[in-house]
Amino acid sequence: MYLGAESTAREGGPAIAFRDLQRAWELLFLLTRRELKLRYQDTVLGFVWSLFKPLLLAAVLFVALKQIVRIDVEDYHLVLLTAIFPWTWFQTSVLIATPAFASNGALIKKVRFPRAVLPLSTITNNGVQFALSLPIIALVVALSGRTPSPVWLIGIPVLGLVQLALMMGVVLFISSLDVFFRDLEHLIEVVLQLWFYVTPVIYPLAIVPERWEIYLRLNPMTPVIEGWRELFTRNTMPAGELWPALLFAAAAIAVGSFTFQRTQGSFADAL
């Protein structure tokens, strides 16, 4: 059985390549829809749960850091909220996508299909949930005395695609290695916890001492998170953050794709 092409170039011309690419997108859509249904089919509130978790986390962090620790940051609730949702998209996608190949061994052995859609469907699934959070961000921004700008109509798709590309590279790399090193599933949980604190999610980069800022700038998620924050709180296209984010995304795609292409031929044997 064959659901998509992994050897299209030698089997046909551009028409076949286009057809198989279309099938891959259709399969990605079907997997994304299936994951969304399975995740919330037995719940009463459904998608509300995907919004409740980051909102609760933001509320707890606000009380702890603003009211107790007394962090001196203006409009700290916006600083938190505009970073928590895109970070949740990243963290949840990486965590769930890590065993995407390893947990689908039977499917990989029996069916030929574009295997990359397995981890990528997790990204798009969580991307839908991130999209549902955008009205909440807009509402909080408006209630804070600021007006959402038409710039958002450009900035949201641009930053969304950049973060999507970055995550695609990361999950292809990690999920490919997880087939051969199953301890990676446990290690990635610890890595993501540490990654959270070295990413300017609970604090803006502006308050970081200069001697430490250069190290945080080496974090691929730093320009992405700062970009979202600048877009939502300042209503400007974060050009200064966009170019580093694009470079990180391109590097991630290159490394992730290379790792996937070099290892996918051994998936069936390893599983």
Predicted regions and their residues:
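Hydrophobic transmembrane alpha-helices and immediately adjacent juxtamembrane helices
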Residues: M1-L271
